[in-house]
C-alpha cells in the first residue's frame, strides 16, 4: 500500500438541545432532561462520522445522501445511516481504517457512556474497538455548548483502498 491508497475525511455536526427529545450520541441513549433537535434521531456524533466517511471517499456529504427534506429519514436511526454510509464507502473501493471523534457538551457528563459509543462504532464500522476513539469534552462554560444550548461533534476518519489492503 502506498500513501495514494490512504484518504482522510473530517466531519462536523451540531444540534440544539431541546425539551421533549431523547439524547442519543454514538447510538447510546443518555439520560438527560433534554435531547438534540433534528430531522432524524439527531445523533451528532454519528452524523459527524458519517460526514467524514463520505468526505474521505469523495462522495459528498451526509445531506446529499440522507437529506433532511426527505420524509424517509424523519426520525431515522443514525446507526442505520452510518452502516449505509460504510456500505457506500466499501462500494467506492475503500475500507475503514480508524475513527477519532470528539463530542463537546457541557452537560451531561458523557465519559461514562463512551465505552458504549465505541462498541457501537466498532460494530457499525466493521472495525476493532481499538480503532475507534471517542473523546468527551466540555467547553468550559463558553459558547453555546458551554451555555448548554447545543452539542457539537467532530470526527476524523482514515480510509484506505480495499484492493491495496488485499495485496499486502
Swiss-Prot record:
Protein EC: 4.6.1.12
The protein's required cofactors: a divalent metal cation
UniProt catalytic activity: 4-CDP-2-C-methyl-D-erythritol 2-phosphate = 2-C-methyl-D-erythritol 2,4-cyclic diphosphate + CMP
Binding positions (4-CDP-2-C-methyl-D-erythritol 2-phosphate): 13-15, 39-40, 61-63, 66-70, 144, 147
Entries under Pfam families matching the protein: YgbB (PF02542)
Amino acids binding a divalent metal cation: 13, 15, 47
Residues of the site described as Transition state stabilizer: 39, 138
GO molecular function: 2-C-methyl-D-erythritol 2,4-cyclodiphosphate synthase activity; metal ion binding
Biological processes, Gene Ontology terms: isopentenyl diphosphate biosynthetic process, methylerythritol 4-phosphate pathway; terpenoid biosynthetic process
Keywords: Isoprene biosynthesis, Lyase, Metal-binding
UniProt cofactor note: Binds 1 divalent metal cation per subunit.
InterPro entries documented for this protein: MECDP_synthase, MECDP_synthase_CS, MECDP_synthase_sf
Gene3D superfamilies in the record: 2-C-methyl-D-erythritol 2,4-cyclodiphosphate synthase (3.30.1330.50)
Enzyme class: lyase
Pathway: Isoprenoid biosynthesis; isopentenyl diphosphate biosynthesis via DXP pathway; isopentenyl diphosphate from 1-deoxy-D-xylulose 5-phosphate: step 4/6
Matches recorded under HAMAP family: IspF
Family named by the database record: Belongs to the IspF family.
Primary role: Involved in the biosynthesis of isopentenyl diphosphate (IPP) and dimethylallyl diphosphate (DMAPP), two major building blocks of isoprenoid compounds. Catalyzes the conversion of 4-diphosphocytidyl-2-C-methyl-D-erythritol 2-phosphate (CDP-ME2P) to 2-C-methyl-D-erythritol 2,4-cyclodiphosphate (ME-CPP) with a corresponding release of cytidine 5-monophosphate (CMP).
Quaternary assembly: Homotrimer.
PANTHER family: 2-C-METHYL-D-ERYTHRITOL 2,4-CYCLODIPHOSPHATE SYNTHASE, CHLOROPLASTIC
Name of this chain's protein: 2-C-methyl-D-erythritol 2,4-cyclodiphosphate synthase
Species name: Ralstonia pickettii (strain 12J)
Lineage of the organism: Bacteria, Pseudomonadati, Pseudomonadota, Betaproteobacteria, Burkholderiales
Amino acid at each position: 500500500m502506498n500513501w495514494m491508497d490512504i484518504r482522510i475525511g473530517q466531519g462536523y455536526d451540531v444540534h440544539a438541545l431541546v425539551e421533549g427529545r431523547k439524547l442519543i450520541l454514538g447510538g447510546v441513549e443518555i439520560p438527560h432532561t433534554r435531547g438534540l433537535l433534528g430531522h432524524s434521531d439527531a445523533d451528532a456524533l454519528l452524523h459527524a462520522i458519517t460526514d467524514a466517511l463520505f468526505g474521505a471517499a469523495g462522495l459528498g456529504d451526509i445531506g446529499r445522501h440522507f437529506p433532511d427534506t426527505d420524509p424517509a429519514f424523519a426520525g431515522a436511526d443514525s446507526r442505520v445511516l452510518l452502516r449505509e454510509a460504510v456500505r457506500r464507502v466499501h462500494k467506492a473501493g475503500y475500507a475503514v481504517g480508524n475513527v477519532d471523534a470528539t463530542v463537546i457538551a457541557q452537560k451531561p457528563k458523557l465519559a461514562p457512556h463512551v465505552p458504549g459509543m465505541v462498541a457501537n462504532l466498532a460494530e457499525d464500522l466493521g472495525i476493532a474497538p481499538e480503532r475507534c476513539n471517542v473523546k468527551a469534552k466540555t467547553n468550559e462554560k463558553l459558547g453555546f455548548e458551554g451555555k448548554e444550548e447545543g452539542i457539537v461533534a467532530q470526527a476524523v476518519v482514515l480510509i484506505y483502498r480495499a484492493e491495496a489492503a488485499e495485496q499486502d
